[in-house]
């Protein structure tokens, strides 16, 4: 999110109901001892506004519900969506809403237990391996007729 803000993206919507905890410190830039137990969306919003005060930011401290996702995607003309949801049902709902509304999506998969950032790759979901979350996403998408 931070590089996109630095690159000059003018509008960002962030929806997250999670708070920062110790396990986030090794992999999330906003996770510090000084930010523990604070809403991730609030800390990220402060950082983004500090990088780009002109940024139009919609930061919502809530877990996104499956039922709301389609409406949010349909009612907003996003150039692309970055999915960092780690719960399967809302992740699938977001992916399918983006596909249905022809909105580009970049979806992160499992990072838990990973320690070598040089092994991060970008691939179509059909080309992923050694990731339980990606496997579950693939399987669920296949049951919906999405390849």
Functional labels for PLM-detected ranges:
Residues 1-147:
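Adenine nucleotide-associated cytosolic modules
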